[in-house]
Amino acid sequence: VVRRISAMSPTWGGDFPQLELENIKHAFLTHIHSDHSGGLSDLILSPWVLGRDSPLYLFGPKGLKDMASNITNAYKLDIDYRLDGSQPANEFGYKTIVEEISEGIVFKDTNIEVTAFYNNHGGLKNSFGYLFVSKDKRILFSGDTAVSTNLISYANKVDILVHEVFSSEGFKTKTDDWKIYHEAHHTSSIDLGLLAEKIQP
């Protein structure tokens, strides 16, 4: 994914300066299920291979420090090979600075404020959504979640709601065990419609 993004930047022949890899400085993870963190090694290492010279800041739930450390340990042979002179490489760009978060403001600069909030992803205790607030926009990213009263409280006056959803029609075709799982961990299209009606993004 990172290489496809970089191909659209001017450095690699594209037309979008916003997609220069040095602009990827921070990443916010909602939870550490594999389907939401499997690409983390790409995000950590590929920008470095392509020239990033500063660490990546990671924000996410407990366990993220171990995950990031294990990724760099798993690729130690590759990292050492590149640092030993097989290609231009620096000793900083593959590193991470990890903040394991709780609910509240987790990042702020002159352009944006990022607030993490607990959502309702079944029995997973450390699962978050994020509210991004700039000078002219409020954007809420739900993460994986069933209907969440806490999310609704953070969604007040958002301009854009990015929310997960499963098909209520498709749900009818699932076996009972999958129905139990989806109802506890995710949001149906019907419930999302009711939520959107309530918060009016």
Go through each PLM region and give its residues.
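Binuclear metal-dependent hydrolase catalytic cores
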Residues: 1-140, 153
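Cap/insert and terminal regions of metallo-dependent hydrolase folds
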Residues: 129, 136-140, 146-201
